[in-house]
Regions:
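Short loop/turn segments that connect beta-strands within beta-propeller blades
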Residues: 2-3, 50-54, 138-142, 204-207, ...
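Surface-exposed loop and turn segments in beta-propeller and other repeat-based domains
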Residues: 3-20, 83, 103-115, 129, ...
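Short coil/turn segments that connect the beta-strands within blades of beta-propeller domains
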Residues: 33-34, 74-75, 163-164, 239-241, ...
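Residue position within the beta-strands of beta-propeller blades
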Residues: 38, 79-80, 168-169, 245, ...
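Residue-level signature of beta-propeller blades and closely related beta-rich strand-turn architectures
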Residues: 42, 83-84, 172-174, 249, ...
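The canonical Cys-X-X-Cys-His
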Residues: 341-353
Length: 369
């Protein structure tokens, strides 16, 4: 079969102002030969594009931060926001709502104060905060069909198998685990040096949600050499038995059981792998994976045997004018090798050099003006 594909989406430049138009197209999927969808990350919208005229004919509003990964399957458009949240906030509220748990201080008084000295401030999970992580649209009507909540905090990759099961590669922040800095004097110790869980969230065709943890859950620590950090790109085999997943912080390609989440094979690839595509034989069995390594600017050609065993065949270096010292810095920023347990990197909190927009208790020195 022939598949429509795209090499890249490119940010438009206003030639008069010499600036970008600030819609940041980062993902594309085709409903059919006549209609395409483009994720506009910075504007929290999906552009609906008429292929024949190459014009944007409408937009789908995404009520979440930075929609990036999108996929069309079975008459449905699936969208996940890159910078989701995990319902955490400061434990402030109205005086009449003080309960010592979700509300521990008067937010109005803190707002007029220089700093938080004298206030009992925690980071808490507030269940009333919206946390929509998956948006599903009908590709004929472009109407929103359903949403799914609380799949993760930073959502990177998305795949849908032939049976309608949805898999989201993500990290889930644990900033609430040591969040009781005010009421219980929490600090970094309570975090167990595990700020994030690296996982794949599965939404079954029937709507059930399961989480495939790629490392042992705290307080257990993984073998540093076997740990997986920053699951990014994910692709399901045609038969739905195997997931092929990149670990962007670990420079690996993984094969996972789609039923249990067990890692059944692993291959070392280039620096910061963020894309994967499968090559299949006539029967639909995957025979090769092509992995895009974002920071080393290379493509890894990985042989697949028996639907899961992985063997690196070749690394194809692409032309890259980036100064070597810049690339080395980006590698250091994105790799989890500097962490004691191999589960997080600088980029875990600061993906693409930005922030995760979450509150953390980090035992940093108090600042005095």
């Amino acid at each position: 079969p022939t598949y429509l594909s795209i090499v890249a989406t490119i940010q438009d430049i206003d030639l008069n102002s010499k600036s970008t138009r600030f819609d940041e197209p980062v993902g594309i999927a085709f409903a059919n030969n006549a209609k395409a969808y483009v994720a506009l990350s910075s504007t929290n919208r999906i552009a609906v594009v008429d292929v024949a005229s190459r014009k944007v004919v409408s937009h789908l509003e995404i009520l979440a931060q930075e929609p990036r990964a999108i996929e069309v399957r079975g008459g449905r458009l699936y969208v996940i926001p890159f910078e989701s949240n995990n319902q955490t906030q400061l434990s402030g509220g109205k005086p009449e709502d003080l309960d010592g748990k979700l509300v521990t201080f008067d937010a109005r008084k803190l707002a007029s104060s220089f700093d938080s000295v004298g206030f009992t401030v925690d980071v808490v999970k507030q269940p009333k905060i919206p946390d929509k992580d998956l948006f599903i649209f009908d590709t004929q009507t472009d109407k929103l069909v359903s949403t799914v909540d609380t799949l993760g905090a930073s959502l990177f990759g998305l795949t849908v198998d032939a049976s309608g099961n949805i898999y989201v590669a993500n990290t889930d922040a644990r900033n609430h685990v040591n969040g009781k800095a005010g009421t219980e004097k929490h600090g970094l110790k309570e975090l167990d040096n595990r700020p994030y869980l690296n996982r794949v969230s599965k939404v079954s065709a029937a709507g059930g949600v399961d989480f495939f943890q790629l490392n042992p859950l705290p307080p257990r620590q993984p073998n540093r050499q076997e740990a997986v950090a920053t699951p990014f790109a994910v692709k399901a085999s045609r038969d739905g038995d195997v997931l092929f997943l990149t670990g962007a912080g670990s420079d690996v390609l993984l094969a996972l059981s789609a039923k249990t989440g067990e890692v059944v094979a692993k291959a070392k690839v280039g620096s910061v792998p963020r894309g994967v595509a499968l090559e299949e034989d006539a029967s639909g069995k995957p025979i090769r994976a092509w992995v895009m390594n974002a920071v080393s600017n290379s493509v890894s050609k990985v042989a697949i045997a028996g639907n899961s065993a992985l063997q690196l065949e070749q690394t194809i270096e692409l032309h890259d004018p980036t100064p070597p010292v810049y690339k080395e810095g980006r590698m250091a920023f994105n790799t989890a090798r500097s962490s004691s347990n191999g589960t997080f990197s600088c980029a875990s909190c600061h993906a693409d050099g930005h922030t995760d927009h979450l509150l953390w208790v980090l035992d940093t020195p108090h600042l005095v003006g």
